[in-house]
Amino acid sequence: MIHRACPVLQLTIALLTLSVLHSNHAAASVSDPYTRVSETESGLVTLEMCERTLKPSAGEGPRIHLISAIHIADKQFYEAMQDRLELYDTVLFEGVKPAGLDAIDPELDDESKAEATRDRLELLLDISDQFHALNARLPEGIDDLMENSEPRIAAIVGSIRSDGWDQPIITSFVDTSISKNGEDKATQYITFTSTGADRQRDGTGVDADISLSSEPYSPNDRRKAAPEGIQTQLANALRVSFQLDEMDMTNPKWINADMDINELQEQLANMGEGDGMILDLIEGNSFQAKLMGFALKFVARSPTMSSMMKLVMMDMLALMESSEMLSQFEEIESVILHGRNNTVIDYLNKELAKDTQVEDIAIFYGAAHMPGLEETIIKDLGYEFESDTWTQAMAVSTEETGLSAGQIKMMRNMIKNALEQQF
């Protein structure tokens, strides 16, 4: 009997569908695949990701390496990717980012610089809130925020500590109190300030100070840290690693070549489909995410269920890339896949336009983005195929699933049939 695999199958289909919608939306492939699953006679199943190297047709310009990313994989995959990407001159990588993270172009007008500065102040407040949740205190300033945060967060803070006019952002605090149940309770809030276009305090118009303040915090205020996202919980359940936990993306030659969260949410909202729920689920904020997280904790406790789910997911990833099963999500696809691909190409064109001796540019993005990127780079930028290199991302022995060879074959057929019926 294979009925005991069905709950895992159903859960995996739900989770993988939502994860794919977030970053690796399936699309019709116009090129050879960027993922593949193979199995040895001994029952070892492996998922491999492709690095496709393109070279200029005319022989001039850098090579472009399209390197398939996957957000959860075995730790060894991320170690291999880290070593390989460090060899390249520039890396353009995937990751929907908070507003305010991009560099501010010094050629912008003052109004645009002011808007970009506000985004930075908002981001600093968000980071300070998470700092308080972890440390039960507010940071004493930007230096404290950097010194006592994990390297990835510290690098973000270091990149946004100046305003749009390249002046240091000022940190200040106000001590106050609120009345609660007839008692005064001491509170404090943090404020981040830019001195504006004139680089001096006060002023009017674009010269006016730009200040944003937090809500008041009390000394004993224990706020909850942000919930784990579905992808982190899925990684834990499958006993694999999460990309952001394993890879150091802070190299100055690495560029986050993706939309920011405000841009993505705005474009999704413009469709009128209420697609903010996708981001809430991936980030762990929705009720559905909490239910799935609860189920994943049970999977994580069972090595057999964990291995079974890992096998199912590997098959699904390869199957989704080679199919059009999610084609009815056409409007969402236009933003999550095609819109973000356009963003990558914009970043790539900026790098190609620079007068440098760059020899190799890597694009580290989800596999489903790659066929479209490859087509654009070949047709519009004058490139051609050079070579493929494959790297193992995940592996599982069928013996670890607790199923017989016949049951595993039946389960794989169930996956294919379930996807075809659902989509």
Where are these regions (language model features)?
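Sec/Tat signal peptide C-region and signal peptidase I cleavage site
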Residues: 22-28
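Bacterial N-terminal signal peptides
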Residues: 10-20
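Zymogen propeptides
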Residues: 29-94
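Bacterial N-terminal signal peptides that target proteins for export
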Residues: 1-12
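A short acidic, amphipathic alpha-helical/loop segment
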Residues: 76-84, 104, 347, 376
